């Protein structure tokens, strides 16, 4: 039995011994299917979830590969219950498929008649189906493609969407590769996205997610709607597209609080899309303003919840999500999987760092002690109040000042959650 850096526990948590000589390799392979939960100094905790396994399967990884990783790096034998659970979970992906027949009707098919029968008896699923065919498949309501995927995922049977997409209005877009080219991982991300039809590309900050979007636009050559977090991001996207593609200023529009332009490539903010007037979304017309062939969601982990409902109605368009993490604060990762698409590509930051594409990062954790007066207040506080008290401790300000003073003349970015503290 190899003395590896991992301890796999029966609750599907995985402990990584950071000081182990093979820890970096194990972390790289583990990131394919497990999410980092906690990262204190010596032991990192990962969690293997059903969604993580299905994302890995959608990206082309098999149950055998996943189990092979755990067995290769585990300090002890992987619990039999975990082995069985992983194999069964991974093999659930793709047992159901959504397809389109020659007449354009959406069809729900299954490789296992028992599974198809099981899900069709679900009350919520049955309302989305329009009848059973002679071959045992089911016709799906034209408007229900997104909702059906959501409901099937909740039942534990994620459907593979092979129903295809509207090509959208043709628009010539080429990469202006004079003196530069997409990096190998960016090319792979674009290739995987096109092969899968829709889905999410996960790249670390600074790795060039915008260029992946530009590459997808050049490959699809269609009217494109780009949704971003704010107007600053919108203008960054515009500048990058003008620099890296054949697009001209007249072909790119900004649709935000200040400007309402609709062009073959339109960049809109999430805020404007979710703005309401009289209780109704005021800018829904943007979704049908042009025959979009591609919709890009920048920083998809920040996608506002109301946009999910709108995205459910965009299932006939190619959708590309860009993000540095699939983890959302509201826990709606399953909606990203169902409505944007599964993970199509994931490049670990360490790998890109080693190749020199992003600056090396040195991470340090500094723990502080509350002073006696703060400890008394903390002890009497509720859980919610405790979080804020710990987060805004004045001791942190003193330490931050020391750290800044230790880096004179350097550019320093301080990130925090509470504005009054910043």
Give the ranges of each region predicted by the language model:
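Extended alpha-helical interface modules used as scaffolds for assembling large macromolecular complexes
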Residues: 1-168
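Conserved pre-motif I regulatory segment
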Residues: 167-202
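Walker A/P-loop
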Residues: 196-217
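Hydrophobic anchor at the beta1->P-loop junction of P-loop NTPases
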Residues: 201-203, 226, 414
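Conserved helix-turn-beta segment of the N-terminal RecA-like "Helicase ATP-binding" lobe
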Residues: 231-258
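Conserved helix/coil segment N-terminal to the catalytic DExD/H
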Residues: 256-294, 302-310
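Post-DEXD/H (motif II) to motif III coupling segment of the RecA-like Helicase ATP-binding lobe
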Residues: 293-294, 299-364
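Conserved interdomain hinge at the start of the Helicase C-terminal
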Residues: 377-421
């Amino acid at each position: 039995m190899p003395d590896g850096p991992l301890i796999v526990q029966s609750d599907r948590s995985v402990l990584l011994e950071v000081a182990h000589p093979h820890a970096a390799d194990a972390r790289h392979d583990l990131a394919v299917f497990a999410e980092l939960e906690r990262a204190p100094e010596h032991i990192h905790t990962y969690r293997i979830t059903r969604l993580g396994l299905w994302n890995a399967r959608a990206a082309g990884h098999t149950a055998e590969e996943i189990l092979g990783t755990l067995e290769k790096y585990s300090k002890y034998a992987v619990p039999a219950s975990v082995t069985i659970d992983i194999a069964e979970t991974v093999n659930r992906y793709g047992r159901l498929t959504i397809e389109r027949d020659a007449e354009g009707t959406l069809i729900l098919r299954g490789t296992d008649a028992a599974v198809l029968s099981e899900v069709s008896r679900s009350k919520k699923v049955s309302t989305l189906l329009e009848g059973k065919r002679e071959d045992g498949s089911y016709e799906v309501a034209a408007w229900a493609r997104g909702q059906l995927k959501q409901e099937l995922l909740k039942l534990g049977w994620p459907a593979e969407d092979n129903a295809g997409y509207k090509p959208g209005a043709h628009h010539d877009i080429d990469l202006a590769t004079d003196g530069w080219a997409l990096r190998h991982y960016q090319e792979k991300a674009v290739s995987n996205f096109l092969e899968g039809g829709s889905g999410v590309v996960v790249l670390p900050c600074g790795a060039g997610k915008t260029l992946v979007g530009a590459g997808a636009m050049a490959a699809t050559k269609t009217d494109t709607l780009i949704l971003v977090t704010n107007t600053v991001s919108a203008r960054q996207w515009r500048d990058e597209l003008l620099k890296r593609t054949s697009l001209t200023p007249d072909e790119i529009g900004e649709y935000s609080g200040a400007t309402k332009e609709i062009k073959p490539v339109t960049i809109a903010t999430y805020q404007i899309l979710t703005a309401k007037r009289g209780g109704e979304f005021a800018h829904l017309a943007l979704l049908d303003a042009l025959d979009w062939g591609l919709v890009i969601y920048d920083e998809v982990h920040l996608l506002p919840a109301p946009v999910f409902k709108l995205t459910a109605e965009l299932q006939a368009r190619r959708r590309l999500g860009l993000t540095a993490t699939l983890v959302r604060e509201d826990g709606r990762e399953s909606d990203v999987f169902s409505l944007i698409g599964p993970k199509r590509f994931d490049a670990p930051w360490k790998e890109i760092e080693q190749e020199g594409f992003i600056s090396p990062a040195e991470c340090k954790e500094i723990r502080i002690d509350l002073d006696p007066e703060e400890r008394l207040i903390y002890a009497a506080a509720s859980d919610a109040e405790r979080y804020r008290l710990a987060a805004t401790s004045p001791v942190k300000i003193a330490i931050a000042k020391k750290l800044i003073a230790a880096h004179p003349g350097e550019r320093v970015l301080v990130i925090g959650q509470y504005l009054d503290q910043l």
